Amino acid sequence: MAVVYYDQDADLNVLKGKKIAVMGYGSQGHSQAQNLKDSGLDVVVGLRPESKSRAAAQAAGLEVKTVAEAAAEADIIQILLPDETQARVYREEIAPYLTGGKVLMFSHGFNIHFNQIVPPADVDVIMVAPKGPGHLVRRTYVEGQGVPALIAIYQDASGKAKEIGLAYAKGIGATRAGVIETTFKEETETDLFGEQAVLCGGTTALVKAGFETLVEAGYQPEIAYFECLHELKLIVDLMYEGGIKYMRYSISDTAEYGDVTRGPRLIDDHVKSTMKSILKEIQDGVFAREWILENQAGRPSFNAFRKKEREHLIEQVGDQLREMMSWLKK
């Protein structure tokens, strides 16, 4: 069973007198910085001089400096920038100021696990990764609750890395819900696999295949959209709330029978074998190398994929149908 830490396992005093630099002010950056500040900690946000987020961070009462300035004065540096920019920013603006005794932190292990960032041996390297989007991390904190998180120690130069990581997790509210111990390897590989095989890649491919099957069989695209995409949220919300068993309890018996008899025919051993090969590409670093090279080349394939996907009939139909849905934000 997983090792889980809670409020009583963490001490915010570990971070007293230390300056924490949060690099980036996106989904995780804004929530973690604000939560740390409201926990009474000394926080500075590191941003590009021209960043559009500077005004928002300042409006939240946060000190804002350039990444280099923030790195120079911080004891703890949390990098919350996009995966594809972290290595360059680290190399140019953080590494020169990452002196012995400092702490380097992440909320995703990609760049450490795949050696795009190689920290010096005399710094702690820690991951605290909330398992929810930034707005939820912030909202639950304000409500006196929290979002569960993962904690991993890659390097423990000080001998106190776990204490520091747990204190940070408490500062953002995560120990209120529970913090699960993991490793950089496990977090990175499972996160990428989930995105590719299930949550993003698997789901979108399944939805499009179902939509295309109905349209090619002569059914109206609008009806196919409702049955294969729009209603997916209803099912996912039920699973999110109570697991697969709760979803099956909530749907009709006809739907449940179709689920348990037809689902395994669709997602069969062949699909599982493909999943295993996708996982192996992640474990072996094949995907990481491919993505790194794609970015270095200016993203030609990625941009072409984006353009092609946006032109799919399902997007056109969806745009039209959502105009009928007054409850959706425009």
From Swiss-Prot:
InterPro entries: 6-PGluconate_DH-like_C_sf, KARI, KARI_C, KARI_N, KARI_prok, NAD(P)-bd_dom_sf. It comes from the Bacteria. The active site is at residue 108. NADP(+) binds at residues 25-28, 48, 51, 53, 83-86, 134. GO terms for molecular function: ketol-acid reductoisomerase activity; magnesium ion binding; NADP binding. Pathway: Amino-acid biosynthesis; L-isoleucine biosynthesis; L-isoleucine from 2-oxobutanoate: step 2/4; Amino-acid biosynthesis; L-valine biosynthesis; L-valine from pyruvate: step 2/4. NCBIfam families: ilvC, PRK05479.1, PRK13403.1. This is Ketol-acid reductoisomerase (NADP(+)). It comes from Moorella thermoacetica (strain ATCC 39073 / JCM 9320). The gene is ilvC.
